[in-house]
């Protein structure tokens, strides 16, 4: 049986996005992304955690698997991350979207 993920990392979770065999859960309550790795057996294991701006709600990965964009509805900010081959995230910037405070929903292409 899989080891439970620590509560501080996961509560509350709003959205999960898959990118190249990794899953990124948006944790609105802790302003983090939980990174999970998929195994060949279908079990997920916690691979790490990355900080975001407050109010993490939705996320979207690019089709190439190179970038992950995270909407933080608290202040209408979109955080931008580069996805490494091993699934780790590097923050590359953030953008304030006018009128997007409290918003939900994001798409990447």
Task: Specify the residue positions occupied by each region the protein language model found.
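Short loop/turn segments immediately following beta-strands, especially the blade-tip
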Residues: 1, 35-44, 80-89
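Beta-propeller fold detector
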Residues: 1-7, 44-52, 89-98
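Beta-rich, blade/repeat-based domains predominating
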Residues: 7-23, 50-67, 97-109
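Generic beta-strand structural signal
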Residues: 18, 38, 61-63, 83, ...
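Short, conserved beta-strand edge motifs with alternating hydrophobic and charged residues
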Residues: 24-27, 34-36
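Glycine-centered loop/turn positions within well-structured domains
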Residues: 31, 42, 66, 76, ...
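Blade-level signature of beta-propeller repeat domains, shared across WD40, Kelch, NHL, RCC1
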Residues: 71-109
């Amino acid at each position: 049986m899989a080891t439970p993920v620590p509560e501080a990392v996961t509560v509350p979770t709003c959205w999960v996005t898959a990118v190249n065999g990794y899953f990124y859960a948006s944790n609105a309550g802790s302003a983090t992304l939980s990174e999970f790795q998929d195994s060949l057996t279908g079990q997920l294991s916690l691979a790490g955690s990355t900080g975001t701006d407050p109010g993490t709600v939705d996320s979207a990965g690019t089709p190439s698997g190179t970038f992950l964009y995270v909407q933080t509805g608290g202040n209408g900010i979109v955080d931008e991350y580069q996805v490494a081959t091993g699934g780790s995230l590097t923050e590359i910037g953030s953008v304030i979207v006018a009128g997007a405070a409290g918003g939900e929903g994001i798409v990447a292409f």
